[in-house]
């Protein structure tokens, strides 16, 4: 499970990430990444007291993916895939980065390994160099 401090819950931040972030897609997911600045005033929205500066992630899993059970299972797989990618040493997320992962219908039938690979690839391409 993804720790609460890494979850994106603000509607405003979801919208800001989707509108202003970099978008990369694959067969199973579309990933929007809005990199925060290195200083607090450059962050998309201020960090709440006690929040981590690590990446925060939100999911969009529409009815096109499947019924409620399928959407929930897909959400769980994507949350775990993001956590696996986040824990890798090869990716360096800038302070205050927000990520929105939108599941495509093929994500419902994809294996966990495929989802991890697609999420990793999309985030790597979307992060600033």
Swiss-Prot record:
<dbReference type="InterPro" id="IPR014721">
    <property type="entry name" value="Ribsml_uS5_D2-typ_fold_subgr"/>
</dbReference>
<dbReference type="GO" id="GO:0030677">
    <property type="term" value="C:ribonuclease P complex"/>
</dbReference>
<keyword id="KW-0819">tRNA processing</keyword>
<dbReference type="InterPro" id="IPR000100">
    <property type="entry name" value="RNase_P"/>
</dbReference>
<comment type="similarity">
    <text>Belongs to the RnpA family.</text>
</comment>
<keyword id="KW-0540">Nuclease</keyword>
<dbReference type="GO" id="GO:0000049">
    <property type="term" value="F:tRNA binding"/>
</dbReference>
<dbReference type="GO" id="GO:0001682">
    <property type="term" value="P:tRNA 5'-leader removal"/>
</dbReference>
<dbReference type="Pfam" id="PF00825">
    <property type="entry name" value="Ribonuclease_P"/>
</dbReference>
<keyword id="KW-0694">RNA-binding</keyword>
<comment type="function">
    <text>RNaseP catalyzes the removal of the 5'-leader sequence from pre-tRNA to produce the mature 5'-terminus. It can also cleave other RNA substrates such as 4.5S RNA. The protein component plays an auxiliary but essential role in vivo by binding to the 5'-leader sequence and broadening the substrate specificity of the ribozyme.</text>
</comment>
<protein>
    <recommendedName>
        <fullName>Ribonuclease P protein component</fullName>
        <ecNumber>3.1.26.5</ecNumber>
    </recommendedName>
</protein>
<dbReference type="InterPro" id="IPR020568">
    <property type="entry name" value="Ribosomal_Su5_D2-typ_SF"/>
</dbReference>
<keyword id="KW-0255">Endonuclease</keyword>
<comment type="subunit">
    <text>Consists of a catalytic RNA component (M1 or rnpB) and a protein subunit.</text>
</comment>
<keyword id="KW-0378">Hydrolase</keyword>
<dbReference type="GO" id="GO:0004526">
    <property type="term" value="F:ribonuclease P activity"/>
</dbReference>
<dbReference type="GO" id="GO:0042781">
    <property type="term" value="F:3'-tRNA processing endoribonuclease activity"/>
</dbReference>
């Amino acid at each position: 499970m993804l720790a609460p401090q890494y979850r994106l819950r603000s509607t405003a931040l979801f919208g800001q990430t989707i509108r202003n972030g970099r978008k990369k897609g694959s067969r199973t997911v579309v990933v929007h990444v809005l990199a925060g600045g290195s200083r607090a005033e450059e962050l998309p929205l201020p960090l709440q007291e006690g929040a981590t500066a690590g990446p925060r992630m939100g999911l969009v899993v529409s009815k096109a993916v499947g019924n409620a059970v399928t959407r929930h299972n897909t959400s769980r797989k994507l949350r775990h895939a993001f956590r696996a990618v986040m824990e890798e040493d090869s990716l360096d997320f800038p302070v205050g980065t927000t990520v929105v992962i939108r599941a495509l219908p093929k994500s419902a039938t994809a294996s966990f390994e495929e989802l991890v690979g697609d999420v990793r690839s999309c985030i790597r391409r979307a992060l600033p160099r």
